UniProtKB/Swiss-Prot annotation:
Keywords: Cytokine, Glycoprotein, Secreted, Signal. It comes from Carassius auratus. Gene3D superfamilies: 1.20.1250.10. It is found in: Secreted. It comes from the Eukaryota. SUPFAM superfamilies: 4-helical cytokines. GO terms for cellular component: extracellular space. The keyword Signal applies. One of its GO terms (biological process) is immune response. Residues 1-26 form the signal peptide. This is Interferon gamma-related. Strongly expressed in spleen. Also detected at lower levels in gill, kidney, heart, brain and intestine. In immune cell populations, expressed at highest levels in peripheral blood leukocytes and at lower levels in splenocytes, granulocytes, monocytes and macrophages. Homodimer. The keyword Secreted applies.
Length: 166
């Protein structure tokens, strides 16, 4: 559970870093011409890598590692870091209260914890979209990054990812 929370903090920190890049000494290009030049450079590097790793053949067509996740970006409602954190905290709180209820010795305490857990569940219902995003993040996090076939698929899908992330 704490790993999920750490991942949210990391994602939020990365988003903050990227948002600050535009203020001083940005690494990302500022004009359309700069963007086109950077995309051209990246495309040339990717094509060179695709040749090196032999991923230009038709057998690699449609073998993108992240394509299912990329296509879902447009269908997702926008989630904020705050709402992801709140959902995660509510989830952990629910787990804590379940454990406390299991250890409770008297019925009054068990009933109170059950009632509070009902409130937590009602609050979590507000964050159903965030829960879907969490599942997506877990799926992405579980990708076997050391698998050669997956690495080649990631190479082939990078330009799409680059364009969407830009």
């Amino acid at each position: 559970m704490y790993c999920r929370l750490n991942m949210v903090y990391l994602i939020c920190a990365l988003l903050l870093i990227v948002s600050l890049q535009g203020t001083v000494g940005a690494r990302l290009p500022q004009s359309q011409k700069d963007k086109e030049q950077m995309l051209k450079n990246v495309r040339e590097k990717i094509e060179s890598l695709q040749k090196h790793y032999h991923t230009t053949g038709t057998e690699w067509f449609g073998k993108s590692v992240l394509s299912s996740h990329l296509h879902q970006l447009n269908s997702k409602a926008s989630c904020t870091c705050q709402s992801l954190l709140l959902d995660s905290m509510l989830n952990i709180t629910e787990t804590i209260f379940q454990d406390m209820r299991g250890k409770a010795e008297n019925e009054e305490t068990k009933t109170s914890l059950r009632d509070v857990m009902t409130e937590v569940k009602m609050l979590r219902h507000k964050y159903s979209e965030e829960q879907k995003v969490w599942r997506e993040l877990q799926d992405i996090h579980s990708v076997e990054v050391n698998n050669g076939k997956i690495q080649k698929g990631a190479l082939n899908s990078f330009l799409i990812l680059y364009d969407l992330a830009y």
